[in-house]
Amino acid sequence: MLQIDHLTMHSLQSGRLFLDDFSYTLRPHERTVIIGEEGNGKSALLKYIYDPTLVEGYMECKGRRIVSREILGYLPQSIDEEEKKVPVYAWFCQQDGFYDMNPSSLGAMAAEMGLEADFWYQDRSFGTLSGGEQIKAMLAALRIKKPTIYLLDEPSNNLDLDVLAWLEKEIVQLPGAVLFVSHDVHLIDACATGVIHMEQLHRKNHPRITVADVDYETYREQRFAAMENQREKAVSDQKKEKLRQQKLQRQYSSVDYALNHISRQDPHGAKLLKKKMKSIKSTEKRYAREKEDMATLPEEEESIVIELSGAPIAPGRKVLELKNYCLKTSDGTLLCPSLNFAVYGPKKIAIIGSNGAGKSTLLRQMLDLLRQAGFQTGYMPQNYAEVLSPEMTPIDFLAPHGDRDSVTVARSWLGSLRYTSEEMTHEVRELSGGQQGKLLLLKMALEKDEVLVLDEPTRNFSPLSQPVLDAAIRNFPGAVISVSHDRQYLGTVPDVIYRLDENGLVEYSGFIGEDR
């Protein structure tokens, strides 16, 4: 059993409180998801549970973590660059329990996970594996370790649709308990039996954490119903309070006027009026006490606000056309010998395909062609470090010239995406993945782009922010070319979905999400 006792967690740099006296018990075989807005401390909590030393450089934590007789397995959101250089076989040799596995057991596991039989012994570097292969390798390493509790941080990032379907089944079937962070609504719906919801209220000055032993859909419904009931009761109570205060004020004014104008020759009448005034003041005090118990409007975490206004593109205008295009990687590896594709007008295009098919490579080459053609083009890469320097601040990125007007506009936009004043001056390296993604969105909003090229745009956005992001991209007046495996995004945003493989781009007509 995993137990957290009275945990308080706050940032060493900003002093912001992320958890306040949080207690929680993860029982055997539970599948609990941690959700919340970007930068609310979800990954930090998961790291603390696995090993408190992982966060001691930037978080101060007080409380108890009890993991008696439990074996913890941790899947990080990403692995560091040095680890990516290690050959696959050497990487597995570093994992607990690998030397105890016999070839037949490894072969059976490879078949079960959809991997090549000799996957474990390959000499290519770990970083050359596709996103799906990396996740499978890390999950395999966890299974070899045989933990009793699995801690998974955004396990669905960078996975294609086929691997996502596999991952959902894998999480459900894992032995032991699972505590995971995810933004993928479909994954959460399929796997979670409980919810931990981390929120930051009052402009991120007050943390609130909600634990619910129900699936995510039920949690959303119960949360919405409870807030609506509280809102209705609060409005009703406020209306009743206003009416009775008005009545009390009329009574007070009437008696006060009578007291000021009563004749001295009527002492009995004055005595009755004073008695009535005393009763009114007593009622006023009673009302004040009762008001403390009245329902208040429900407190909700402020949602993000984003609009990608952009520059409109006329329907029918050719944006990009590829004819018999040969798709190769930067080192000359052939991915597709002949590719045909065209985008016209303000179309919203999404590209899907297996990990390693070349989607990100194609997207970068499309970006170059669009800019060569003179289109003002915004770009969100899968790896934010391609465009974000780790030393710069959000203000530096959005207002590089540093003039007062540009800085004022940048601060206003950052505030609309729930950045605090302190976060606006933090270095990019200190921001969460979601906060970095928001920076790229703001850059596109400020530059009035004609075309957006987006590689996994929703990958670091919470289930609560994603509908806002989806709507912003859908309502963008220009063209959008995106790569995504997010089923909610694919079901709501693109006009057309293409699948990329070695034969080219083919329009995809399969069922994805809830709206297709």
Model feature map: region roles:
Residues M1-N229, A314-R516:
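ABC ATP-binding cassette signature C-motif
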Residues M227-L334:
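Flexible nucleotide-interacting loop at or near the entrance of a catalytic core
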